[in-house]
Swiss-Prot record:
Each ANK repeat, start to end: 288-317, 327-357
Keyword Nucleus (UniProt): no
Biased composition regions of type Low complexity, renumbered to the chain: 173-186, 229-248
Designated name of the protein: Ankyrin repeat domain-containing protein SOWAHC
Record's compositionally biased regions (Basic residues): 453-462
PROSITE patterns: ANK_REP_REGION, ANK_REPEAT
Organism this protein belongs to: Mus musculus
Disulfide bridges in this chain: none
Length: 512
């Protein structure tokens, strides 16, 4: 046998087929040692020829366990498990399919336990002169032989360039098909190359997983083994993101046009929109909370403000001149901020805007007026009243107002009203000493200055004489008559809850 051994692809195929499509590298070299010998140049050419033949029909892989090299027969030259070559040669010529489109190589690795030599077809010629550039699948698994009733498998033959864009595929019917005449289909049926390529792309791109329909995603999940949960979670998360993005509120075109026209203060466009939808007059800006009145006051356009109010009056629409924005500002606040005096006059004088409304920072419109504003404007807005309230007399440097000194439930004990500047002679009990005499001189001096305290007809200050009782002041021990003891007890009961407020109050020229 060794004498007739020749170095050819048929011999290598036969050797690998007899050993189940897999043999050790050293065993293969040892088998063809006789034809690889000779002179140096002859031996070199023989080795190169041997490498080309082996690469054409098989691949060399290294076992990661022990590092041993094995030669595996290529998938196109083997089927599931077959008897030796002589017993398995087909009696009938195989069917050949010629397709114009090149076939995508099958990406799923098929087990290769046996082999079947395809040299019976005279039309199929093996070109073994060049190297094979096809990428081979990973090493096949070693296992038991398959049964005779195994499903049909498609064997792909080597494609040669017999013509542009043409390829030849060799199909060999298995033994079960020849006997039964039918090809059963089962879960072990090889998958199409298109489906394998699709699964590979989907496995490497999670974005494509999300776009796959429910039916398509199941097939890909089965091939990956347990990837259905990951795909479902990715699909649910992407659905939540899309729903959150799509749930953003879209502004109505009419509201959008109204917001732009109101912010620009154009009456021509505002009139047309109001005619179409009168309810826009009280429409608030969803960002600042401004109405068209706020925008007109902010821009200082008193004519636009008057037109808007006249339109509301003409069409009997409710309009609130004191409406607040998101920051609590009224139209009067905005006009005072930007120093629009004419708008302030129109709002307060013509439309009776409330000057005592405070914004959310606690400030009135008069507190936004600049120092350069005329006195009559400040008086119109109420700034002079604020200055009078902040004067030293109001802060406690002068005479006190009764509303700030005494509770309201004891005002029935007040004496008759007197004019400002009148001197009151108070009866001070004998033996009474004030708590802070050092401040009396300063308080009296401030009260004696007539220039600082001017009488106002609309604000009359009430003066009275406070009766200092003995129990209210611990350090006061006056000698009282027996007839006044009952009155003192009544005063004590009425002022018992307020003794702490009177205990430390200093004497003044008003109360003694």
């Amino acid at each position: 046998m060794e004498g007739s051994l020749e170095l050819s692809s048929e011999a290598i195929l036969r050797f690998l087929a007899e050993r189940g499509g897999r043999a050790g590298h050293s065993e293969l070299v040892q088998h063809f040692r006789d034809v690889l010998g000779g002179q140096r140049e002859q031996r070199t050419r023989a080795r190169e020829r041997f490498k080309e033949l082996v690469n054409a029909v098989a691949t060399v892989r290294t076992d990661p366990a022990d590092g041993t090299k094995y030669v595996h027969l290529k998938k196109r030259f083997c089927t599931g498990d077959s008897p030796p070559l002589e017993a398995k040669l087909p009696r009938e010529p195989p069917r050949i399919e010629v397709t114009e489109e090149p076939q995508v190589p099958d990406l799923a690795a098929e087990p290769c336990e046996g082999s079947q030599l395809q040299e019976a077809n005279p039309q199929l010629s093996l070109g073994l002169g060049g190297e094979v550039s096809d990428q081979e699948p990973p090493a096949p698994a070693q296992g038991g032989a398959q049964g005779k009733d195994s499903p049909p498998q498609e064997v792909e033959a080597v494609s040669w360039a017999s013509g542009p864009g043409s390829s030849e595929n060799l199909k060999l019917p298995p033994q079960g098909e020849a006997e039964g005449g039918s090809s059963p289909s089962g879960p072990n049926t090889p998958r199409s190359a298109r489906q394998n390529f699709r699964d590979l792309v989907l496995g490497s791109s999670p974005q494509l997983k999300r776009s796959v329909g429910p039916g398509d995603g199941n097939a890909g999940g089965r091939s990956r083994g347990g990837g259905d949960s990951d795909t479902a979670s990715l699909a649910s998360s992407s659905a939540e993101e899309e729903s959150s993005v799509g749930a953003s509120v879209t502004l109505d075109p009419l509201d959008h046009a109204w917001m732009l026209s109101a912010s620009e203060g154009k009456w021509d466009s505002l009139e047309g929109l109001l005619t179409c939808e009168p309810g826009l007059l009280s429409k608030r800006d969803f960002i600042t909370g401004f109405t068209c009145l706020h925008w007109a006051a902010k821009h200082g356009r008193q004519e636009l403000l008057a037109m808007l109010v006249n339109f509301a009056t003409k069409h009997q629409l409710p309009v609130n001149i004191n409406a607040k924005s998101s920051g609590g500002y009224t139209a009067l606040h905005l006009a005072a901020m930007h120093g629009h005096v004419e708008v302030v006059k129109l709002l307060v004088g013509a439309y009776d805007a409330d000057v005592d409304i405070r914004d959310y920072s606690g400030r009135k419109a008069s507190q936004y007026l600049s120092e350069s504003i005329a006195e009559e404007i400040k008086n119109l807005v109420g700034a002079l009243d604020e200055d009078d309230g902040d004067s030293p007399a109001a802060r406690g440097g002068g005479r006190w107002r009764l509303s700030k000194v005494l509770p309201s439930h004891i005002t029935h004990k007040l004496s008759p009203v007197v004019e400002d500047g009148a001197e009151l002679h108070h009866h001070v009990p004998e033996g009474w000493t004030g708590g802070s005499k050092a401040k009396d001189s300063g308080r009296k001096a401030s009260g004696s200055s007539s220039g600082r305290m001017k009488p106002r007809l609309n604000k009359i200050r009430f003066r009275t004489q406070i009766i200092h009782t003995t129990p209210s002041f611990r350090d006061a021990k006056p000698t009282l008559e027996e007839g006044e003891e009952e009155e003192e007890e009544e005063e004590e009961r009425s002022l018992r809850g307020y003794s702490s407020s009177f205990k430390l109050r200093p004497k003044s020229n008003v109360f003694g």
